[in-house]
Amino acid sequence: MSSGSKEGGGGSPAYHLPHPHPHPPQHAQYVGPYRLEKTLGKGQTGLVKLGVHCITGQKVAVKIVNREKLSESVLMKVEREIAILKLIEHPHVLKLHDVYENKKYLYLVLEHVSGGELFDYLVKKGRLTPKEARKFFRQIVSALDFCHSYSICHRDLKPENLLLDEKNNIRIADFGMASLQVGDSLLETSCGSPHYACPEVIKGEKYDGRRADMWSCGVILFALLVGALPFDDDNLRQLLEKVKRGVFHMPHFIPPDCQSLLRGMIEVEPEKRLSLEQIQKHPWYLGGKHEPDPCLEPAPGRRVAMRSLPSNGELDPDVLESMASLGCFRDRERLHRELRSEEENQEKMIYYLLLDRKERYPSCEDQDLPPRNDVDPPRKRVDSPMLSRHGKRRPERKSMEVLSITDAGSGGSPVPTRRALEMAQHSQRSRSVSGASTGLSSSPLSSPRSPVFSFSPEPGAGDEARGGGSPTSKTQTLPSRGPRGGGAGEQPPPPSARSTPLPGPPGSPRSSGGTPLHSPLHTPRASPTGTPGTTPPPSPGGGVGGAAWRSRLNSIRNSFLGSPRFHRRKMQVPTAEEMSSLTPESSPELAKRSWFGNFISLDKEEQIFLVLKDKPLSSIKADIVHAFLSIPSLSHSVLSQTSFRAEYKASGGPSVFQKPVRFQVDISSSEGPEPSPRRDGSSGGGIYSVTFTLISGPSRRFKRVVETIQAQLLSTHDQPSVQALADEKNGAQTRPAGTPPRSLQPPPGRSDPDLSSSPRRGPPKDKKLLATNGTPLP
């Protein structure tokens, strides 16, 4: 994540912003009150754009996430990042202001800092003085100490994720890999960047996230003082071996007391590695206490009273949604029990921290918005009705627009057609703790989920028991959510027919959660702008006629705005059993594999053809088998006399790091029917076509493997491409002549994202630890 010059999540959105000259104001793109301007960062998964408030002129960084181009597991990590950022309030952690969304994009409104990345600063200045390095290091440790006090582990610390403000103070960004480490449990997901990841993470072992962060801090401190990395190699396999051994050269110019600190932090044995408390007591760390820096003052702790909730008290739905996004509170019954217990526990701490955040920074409707001509403008995530600390409901803070809609339904002034539809849609949107987690579909192949938690004190005390159509009920507590951006009266469309919603039978509840079909806030009273035809008055009591018209309006709106998409990109090579349970709750291993995968789906069958001339069939088959055997980590089987099945994958490492490429090779005669083979298996010369068909796996790696096989078939000499493929598999990169072997200079632009990442800058933001397809971990 970034707000200065860093990459962001999401695909490239369709924003056409000014080139050299500004457009008239009516052509500007807005996210809420923020006008989008120049692009601050551009990565493989999205954009970060500068946003300027249309009234106050406040600058923010808007991270744009394209939901349709990312897998469901990655989107769930974005939601977890949002929830974690709401837990952290520290001067050296990047702030999250708000979250907006429409059907296609998710917009994270972040604090804007103008100093760029610490990585670029280090490249520009070279190694830093011990005084300046200590300043940065103490700020990083201060922020980490705050995060660890709330059991939050970053797990991807590196100079690229450390931003600088205008006063050169640190802001830790990109909590996409962060996790809550509950109690004494250990983490399992291997993540991070290979140059900064600790040995236990690389080995695929269970690890303490706090100790892993300490290793990364040691590597960062070494880079600040030396201008190079302690572990560096062009070959990824060799790099990982160096990290596991933990042997590095300590330059003589590093102060002796700092050398002892570095050795204590970059320690292979996690039990011997220095903890945060030990680091903060180290002489070199304390040596800068006399250096004045107001930003080094510890952040005031957030003290919240943790009380036990009464058995009949209501739990805040926004807070529960955020806790669900954190991924470690999946046992609903246990969470319910812990929140209502008399003793203090971590569940109550997280609950009251999020509730305190919601009370202090309520997310309400935007009051002053610029004119918008967008078909599907971004809408702000707003809070559900507020609950007190004792579970009592508070009056909801409603904007004038919401009041106008609810009052219009009871005889007030009419609402403009377009605005009424927008606000009616918005009232049904997922809500969160000032932008915390919303209800993502838990499966990329299924309809959206119901609320993760639906605690009701009594069986008859829910919304349906109170009456969804009660005249006094103008707000919703926790409705069963439909698709993002969809209305409450529409059913989630199946993947095969997304544009034709199927409304339920009139009068029947829409979901199994027991939520009424329609709420008082979501009765459309007018058709969208530009829709031919008018809306007839609803039937008395909302009978069959009203339901039919609502269904028709939903259908028109879907065809006008586009239906939500629930079929995410497929994860890497899921089996039939995995396809039936693609949720992190039921398949954590699959969720881990999906994070390392390149999220490439095969929309069509990919084939590569090779025509061979004047060569007998037996010779072609022998050459193919020889090519198979010459490629490391490639296995094959014979299907028939003219067909082979091959698989190229890493061997010897944890299964989470393997990305197999499976393909089939077929030989056919291009001169009529296939000639009959002789007794010795050979046939006469002719023209043969060799077809390589990708079955599963990354397309780019498939092409590289086929190119290597083709080189063998087209020549009788050993081809350097075989070794090139092996080097690529091991993570090697070709350096241009004159490139310094060890430095922190930024790598040149690469057109092949599947090639191993530069050791200087770490892998791309989304690739994390696995930089190449099929790279083995010894």
Curated annotation (Swiss-Prot):
The name on file for this protein is Serine/threonine-protein kinase BRSK1
Biological function = Serine/threonine-protein kinase that plays a key role in polarization of neurons and centrosome duplication. Phosphorylates CDC25B, CDC25C, MAPT/TAU, RIMS1, TUBG1, TUBG2 and WEE1. Following phosphorylation and activation by STK11/LKB1, acts as a key regulator of polarization of cortical neurons, probably by mediating phosphorylation of microtubule-associated proteins such as MAPT/TAU at 'Thr-504' and 'Ser-554'. Also regulates neuron polarization by mediating phosphorylation of WEE1 at 'Ser-642' in postmitotic neurons, leading to down-regulate WEE1 activity in polarized neurons.
Give me the stretches of Basic and acidic residues compositional bias: 362-383
Give the active-site positions. D156
Tell me a GO cellular component: nucleoplasm
Annotated region (Disordered), positions in chain: 1-29, 362-548, 560-588, 719-778
Using the record's annotation, list all stretches that form the Protein kinase domain.
34-285
By sequence similarity, the record places it as follows: Belongs to the protein kinase superfamily. CAMK Ser/Thr protein kinase family. SNF1 subfamily.
Q: Which UniProt keywords apply?
A: ATP-binding, Cell cycle, Cell projection, Cytoplasm, Cytoplasmic vesicle, Cytoskeleton, DNA damage, Kinase, Magnesium, Metal-binding, Methylation, Neurogenesis, Nucleotide-binding, Nucleus, Phosphoprotein, Serine/threonine-protein kinase, Synapse, Transferase
For this chain, the Swiss-Prot or TrEMBL PTM comment says:
Phosphorylated at Thr-189 by STK11/LKB1 in complex with STE20-related adapter-alpha (STRADA) pseudo kinase and CAB39. Not phosphorylated at Thr-189 by CaMKK2. In contrast, it is phosphorylated and activated by CaMKK1. May be inactivated via dephosphorylation of Thr-189 by PP2C.
Q: What is its EC number?
A: 2.7.11.1, 2.7.11.26
* Omega-N-methylarginine PTM sites in chain numbering: R466, R481, R484, R498, R525, R550
Q: Which GO terms describe its biological process?
A: associative learning; axonogenesis; central nervous system neuron differentiation; centrosome duplication; DNA damage response; establishment of cell polarity; G2/M transition of mitotic cell cycle; microtubule cytoskeleton organization involved in establishment of planar polarity
Q: What happens when the gene is disrupted?
A: No visible phenotype. Mice are fertile and healthy. In contrast, mice lacking both Brsk1 and Brsk2 show little spontaneous movement and are only weakly responsive to tactile stimulation: they die within 2 hours of birth. Defects are due to impaired neuronal differentiation and polarity.
| A Gene Ontology molecular function term of the record | magnesium ion binding
Q: Which residues carry this modification: Phosphothreonine?
A: T189, T529, T535, T583
The UniProt regions of compositional bias labelled Gly residues, in chain numbering, are: 1-12
Give the compositionally biased regions (Low complexity): 430-457, 509-533
| Cofactor(s) in the UniProt record | Mg(2+)
Q: In which tissues is it expressed?
A: Present in the gray matter of the brain and spinal cord (at protein level). Expressed in the nervous system, distributed within the brain and spinal cord of embryonic and postnatal animals.
- Gene source species: Mus musculus (Mouse)
